[in-house]
């Protein structure tokens, strides 16, 4: 265990017996998280039922060194990377305004993703998702207020998750939104996202309402 005090780099000193070869796994996570069981870095267990949706609070990093042979005063540079795929779901700001007229105020609602077939275990030494595939739903939290511009249109972020998927795996993504007292709720299928380590996959559309234009003309003739 080593605290970085918020820094992005830290020095770790280990006392290793000379003349031997070592494979070493590294894992970094925020303090206070209980959704990761790191008793075995080659089989880190992820309990998604303890993971809060929509945030970077549970973001983690891993790294590895293979066949390290020690000599006096060795210094080894290790870069830690993110094992997750980040999935974002956005809808147009016009859609947000339209759905608010139906009584859905997104500023007072919570959201979470439901994803199917993702991994529940991670091998930090080899950087591989492992374990059985599981269908999971994270703990709902406040809908983000982030606004993004994509191809000239503005979109609001509805949900954002860090997902551990198997290599190049297509994942079905559903989004659930609910009010504090659960009197108002919405759910929809957002689409398929690709699970690739260290990559962000963005799903964007108009998910709540459709804009329909009627071309109306008056036929004044009377037969």
Language-model features and meaning:
Residues 1-96:
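Short, low-hydrophobicity acidic/polar segments
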Residues 93, 205-207, 220:
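Non-catalytic surface loops within mature trypsin-like serine protease
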Residues 1-38, 96-195, 214-223:
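Tryptophan-paired
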Residues 196-210:
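Phox homology (PX) phosphoinositide-binding domain
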């Amino acid at each position: 265990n080593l605290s970085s005090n918020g820094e992005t780099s830290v020095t770790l000193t280990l006392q290793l017996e000379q003349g031997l070869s070592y494979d070493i796994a590294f894992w970094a996570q925020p303090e206070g998280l209980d959704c990761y069981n790191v008793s075995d870095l080659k089989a880190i267990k992820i309990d998604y039922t303890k993971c809060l949706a929509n945030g970077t609070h549970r973001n983690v990093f891993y790294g590895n060194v293979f066949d390290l042979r020690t000599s006096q005063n060795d210094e080894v540079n290790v870069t830690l990377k993110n094992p997750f795929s980040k999935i974002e779901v956005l809808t147009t700001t016009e859609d947000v305004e339209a759905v608010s007229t139906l009584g859905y105020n997104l500023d007072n609602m919570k959201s979470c993703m439901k994803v199917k077939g993702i991994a529940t275990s991670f091998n930090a030494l080899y950087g591989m998702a492992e374990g059985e595939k599981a269908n999971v739903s994270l703990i709902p939290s406040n809908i983000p207020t982030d606004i993004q511009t994509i191809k000239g249109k503005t979109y609001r972020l509805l949900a954002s998750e860090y997902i551990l998927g198997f290599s190049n795996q297509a994942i079905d993504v559903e989004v659930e939104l609910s009010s504090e007292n659960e009197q108002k709720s919405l759910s929809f299928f957002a689409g398929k996202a690709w699970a690739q380590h260290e990559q962000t996959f963005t799903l964007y559309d108009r998910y709540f309402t459709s804009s329909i234009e009627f071309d109306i003309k008056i036929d004044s003739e009377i037969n």
